[in-house]
Regions:
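Short, basic (Lys/Arg/His-rich) helix/loop patches that form interaction surfaces
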Residues: 43, 104-160
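Acidic donor-binding helix in nucleotide-sugar-dependent glycosyltransferases
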Residues: 14, 161
Length: 162
């Protein structure tokens, strides 16, 4: 996930809340929905992460299939969508790319379902990796986002899309 933060320029929560349908391998894009300020945007899916991300999604699909066999398999979707498409919560595309290991009670619906992974776990992993790399400064998911921006600007890439 940390490599996706850097490679895709994602914020920590954007990565955690990424859904399967938001990854377009054909065009090499990631669709970020409801990012900072509630804005949607599109970012690049790095080529060097495609195989790894594809394997992650295949593992999530298998987990979803297992959840369905055990009588679960729902995922949280916005209320308006749930009303319009009652079966959408069970569709694979709506499931998280990085789900929690265990199912839990969703406080909004009162149903047991798989939530997205925990942001604190990703934050700790980034911090631990920075310490192992010998970084004495504080490193976070936002630091990785700033690094990719700096590297792109240094290579003459225009970041604003009109």
């Amino acid at each position: 996930m940390a490599r996706l933060l850097y490679g895709g320029g994602l914020r920590l929560l954007e990565c955690i809340r990424l859904r399967i349908q938001d990854v377009d391998f054909g065009q090499g894009l990631i669709f970020v929905r409801g990012g900072k300020g509630g804005r949607d945007r599109t970012t690049l899916l790095p080529r060097n992460l495609r195989d790894e991300l594809q394997a992650q999604i295949e593992a999530v699909k298998a987990l979803h299939h297992q959840d369905l066999e055990e009588g679960f398999g729902d995922v949280y979707i916005p209320e308006a969508l749930a009303r319009k498409y009652p079966k959408a919560a069970r569709e694979t595309g709506w499931h998280w790319v990085f789900p929690a290991r265990a199912r839990s009670l969703d406080p909004r619906s009162g149903r047991v379902m798989r939530q997205p992974g925990r942001a604190s776990g990703l934050h700790k992993a980034v911090t631990r990796a920075a310490a192992q790399a010998g970084r004495d400064k504080r490193v976070s998911g936002q630091t990785l986002r700033h690094c990719v921006t700096t590297h792109l600007l240094a290579h003459g890439v225009h970041l604003r899309v009109r």
